[in-house]
Curated annotation (Swiss-Prot):
This is Threonylcarbamoyl-AMP synthase. The gene is tsaC. It comes from the Bacteria. One of its GO terms (cellular component) is cytoplasm. Coiled coil: none annotated. NCBIfam families: L-threonylcarbamoyladenylate synthase. Residues 5-186 form the YrdC-like domain.
Amino acid sequence: MDDYTQSINDAVKCLRQGGVIAYPTEAVYGLGCDPFNHDAVAQLLTIKKRSIKKGFILIASEWKQVEPLTEPIDPKALARVFDTWPGPFTWTFPASKEAPHWITGQHSTIAIRVTAHPLAKLLCQRFAGPLISSSANQEGEPPIRDVKILRLVFGNKIDKTLEGPLGPTHRPTPIRDAITGEILRL
């Protein structure tokens, strides 16, 4: 990861200044920002042409980065979630009052993934918190896996691009309900 130190530091600086970045994830390039910066989230919504009602997925390097945003759930259900993390699995949890409405959208839940992607994980570690992780595409378009296409589609709308290898998965991560285990998206 030493090859990426400066790029990650630049991306973290951009995030702290309220910027929107692109970065590699388990499956596709993601667009993200500081989930607690309303202006940054509004900019991301504009870039993606996405409704605030849909909400966003958060990625984290570890559970403790996102735990305050969730209500407690049954320990057995939580153990089932932890069995899949870190990894390419997103789970929805009951949102706590700490979770901003612009993250949850019209939902009473919050979608979370503890990532195993080395660069995304390091990005969350250096940022010292979770990030919004939304596939790099505009509403209704396929997610982007190639940095050249990313630049062509988004141009200077994105403040910083962290280039790096994508994970081995070719589809966005599945989403499951943390309480019931129900599959919400495959």
